[in-house]
């Protein structure tokens, strides 16, 4: 259908308002079946157009459905049939200038429309209609597609303005401080907000998972780690590694292996995954597999003190002490401030009864990390074990002064005071340790053992039960059951003692002490056959660990590029450095033997002579730690301890 603007006859005479009217003609294209005989005219008033225009009837074809509007803008005529015939070649250009081609489809108006609607332009009406339709269309809102309440809450949190990235670091530090003060609920709230704002960052998942694990909320921690792996698309090796450690703690060894493998796939340079996986295999007795994993860790991650330290411990267990010392030396070269390496090396020397060398290594450990609680604890227990009770007490007090919230130091100090001082002071120290960390099982076990030795069997049973209520599947629980079994054995409850021994072995079947204690019980009852059967069961079920030195051949290519040099270092009798080390240790032993026959001097002077290092503990405390060696007993006063405990509980 076509329409044209055609002026009426009355428009030929100009008017003062310079107005005229046009008629809108609708023409139907020529169709063989139905030809249009007369046009339909609709009168439209126009303004500002003078002159006469008339209808031009172009030739139509059945395919031509375009809509034309011809308007004569001036008296001279922009487009007319005469000009069209005269200017045949310029027809196209004139048409483009004078003819307005309307390509927007229009709807036919019915006869019932009012004259006011007829005066409006059709394009404006269509635009207005489309605008109304667009207003009625719903805007895409992501939260409508989320059904669960947790998803809607997460979407609402993401919809808010996202804080700067520096706020994540500050929040993580604040949560760490709160967790250190045992304010786990506040720390959890902060970390949950971090996860809501930064779901792609793995650090909040790791921190929150560790807090949940400390509270024995292992199922929640597992769900959190799984969610973290999904949010990070499996690319965060730290979450995989923490999840693997959790599964290993729960006893799911196969699942833990799969997760450690996933951690190494996510990042083959993640040394903690290789090291944790190796420790798992060591506990399972797969020494060759553990060595292979540690070798891969060195290959992909480079020199690392923790891997060297674990390899050294394996060598020490196998009886290859010179290789163990060499690997410990490599660990301290990698990181001279690694307190763990110095302590492990010192324990090796203690096993070999080379006490001066061990003291020198303990000095290195506290100098590398002056506030490390493990260094002061191990050193203090060592000194007390070799007979230096006063020095051991002093070292434990120093560790407590530097770490007043650590329960292990107070536990060891309490046992030391019970053995060499009074039970009341020991009881106060153990009670304080249990208040610092109520979920620390060894504290309750030690306290129960002390009460049993004092004859308070009922109190001892309650304390043992309290320890088992924390977690009944750990190695500490196994030791607790063994100690409780001894209590029942001495009390005459033999059936209860047998049940407790059996429960302890169900947790840790490799406990030599538990097997032999049970066998001794049966032997004391006159059942020698049963006692021998129990001993045979231990030797039959124990894990046989076969370890040889064949792994060194393939391992040398990784630990040092200079293969020949390392071979010489590990070759007994041909290494000058090892010979010098052996000579030095022998000289230390001779010094120790010669000093044992002399009169004892002051503790500080005796230490300087034994170690030969000139290390003065009192000077070190004053200069490096700002502690007065004469005022270490202040924090251990019973009244001060009670006030501190009450303030700590009220603050929490």
Swiss-Prot record:
Entry's Gene Ontology BP terms: mRNA processing; plastid organization; regulation of translation; response to red light; RNA processing
User: Pfam families this protein is in?
Assistant: TPR_14, TPR_16
**GO CC annotation, single:** chloroplast
Give me the ranges of the annotated region Disordered. 1-21, 78-121, 585-610
Q: What is the effect of changing residue 244 to T?
A: In hcf107-1; reduced accumulation of 5'-end-processed psbH transcript and reduced psbB translation, resulting in disruption of photosystem II (PSII) and seedling lethal plants
The family database entries (PROSITE patterns) matched by this protein are listed as:
TPR, TPR_REGION
> What is known about its induction?
By continuous red light (Rc at 8 umol.m-2.s-1).
**Location in or out of the cell:** Plastid, Chloroplast; Plastid, Chloroplast membrane; Plastid, Chloroplast stroma
Targeting presequence: 1-68
Which keywords does this chain's UniProt record carry? Chloroplast, Membrane, mRNA processing, Plastid, Repeat, RNA-binding, TPR repeat, Transit peptide
Q: Specify the superkingdom.
A: Eukaryota
Quote the disruption phenotype from the UniProt entry.
In hcf107-2, reduced accumulation of 5'-end-processed psbH transcript, as well as psbB translation, resulting in disruption of photosystem II (PSII) and seedling lethal plants. Specific loss of processed RNAs with a 5' end 44nt upstream of the psbH start codon in the psbB-psbT-psbH-petB-petD gene cluster.
Q: How does it sit in the membrane?
A: Peripheral membrane protein
Task: Provide the transmembrane region boundaries.
Answer: none
* InterPro entries per record: HAT (IPR003107), Mbb1-like (IPR044624), TPR-like_helical_dom_sf (IPR011990), TPR_rpt (IPR019734)
Q: Name one GO molecular function term.
A: mRNA binding
Which residue ranges have biased composition labelled Basic and acidic residues? 105-121
Q: What does this protein do?
A: Involved, directly or indirectly, in the processing of chloroplast encoded mRNAs. Exhibits sequence-specific RNA binding and RNA remodeling activities, probably leading to the activation of translation of the target gene cluster psbB-psbT-psbH-petB-petD. Blocks 5'-3' and 3'-5' exoribonucleases (e.g. polynucleotide phosphorylase (PNPase), RNase R) in vitro. Necessary for intercistronic RNA processing of the psbH 5' untranslated region or the stabilization of 5' processed psbH RNAs. Also required for the synthesis of psbB.
Q: How does it assemble?
A: May form homomultimers. Part of a multi-subunit complex in the range of 60-190 and 600-800 kDa in chloroplast membranes.
Name of the molecule in the record: Protein high chlorophyll fluorescent 107
Q: Which organism is it from?
A: Arabidopsis thaliana
